[in-house]
Amino acid sequence: MQVILLEPGRLGKTGDVVNVKPGYARNWLIPQGIAAPATASNMKTLEAQVRARKKQQEREKAQAEDLASRLNGVAVELSVRAGEGKIYGAVTHADVADALDKLGFDVDRRRIEMPKTVKEIGEYDIAYRAHPEVTIPMKLVVHAQK
């Protein structure tokens, strides 16, 4: 029996059409909401959902590329309390996100990639992953507060 997977799992990813034994489909997959029968109407609905998902992904990628063009070459400068080259505490993803917010860029702190923990004054290479296919390199400049 052919079913359309509604949730990712052992059988495949969401939207895949897979062959399973009829009893497994009737008694487990369909009642649990993991799959739906592969009827003509369900296939049309699936195709419409796939098209809508593709359009959404293209929109998200275009937005990420627009953000990349605006963020290109931006240096994030942070003033932190420090003593003898070492800073008190560490520069976190949230600190970088706040600095970018002050510059007028609304970013998600969880998408900021920092190669290591920043605990010293200096210049660091960081990146912002705006989309799985779009990574924006930036400079982080940490200097002592005066």
From Swiss-Prot:
Q: Name the HAMAP family on file.
A: Ribosomal_bL9
Protein species of origin: Deinococcus geothermalis (strain DSM 11300 / CIP 105573 / AG-3a)
Keywords, sorted A to Z: Ribonucleoprotein, Ribosomal protein, RNA-binding, rRNA-binding
Question: Could you tell me which SUPFAM superfamilies the record lists for this protein?
Answer: L9 N-domain-like (SSF55658), Ribosomal protein L9 C-domain (SSF55653)
Question: Can you say what this protein is called?
Answer: Large ribosomal subunit protein bL9
Where exactly are the transmembrane stretches of this chain? none
Its domain of life? Answer: Bacteria
Q: Which PANTHER family match?
A: 50S RIBOSOMAL PROTEIN L9
Q: Name one GO cellular component term.
A: ribonucleoprotein complex
Claim: Endoplasmic reticulum is one of the keywords in the record: no
Q: What does this protein do?
A: Binds to the 23S rRNA.
A molecular function (GO) held by this record is: rRNA binding
- Record-stated family: Belongs to the bacterial ribosomal protein bL9 family.
Which biological process annotations from GO are given for this protein?
translation
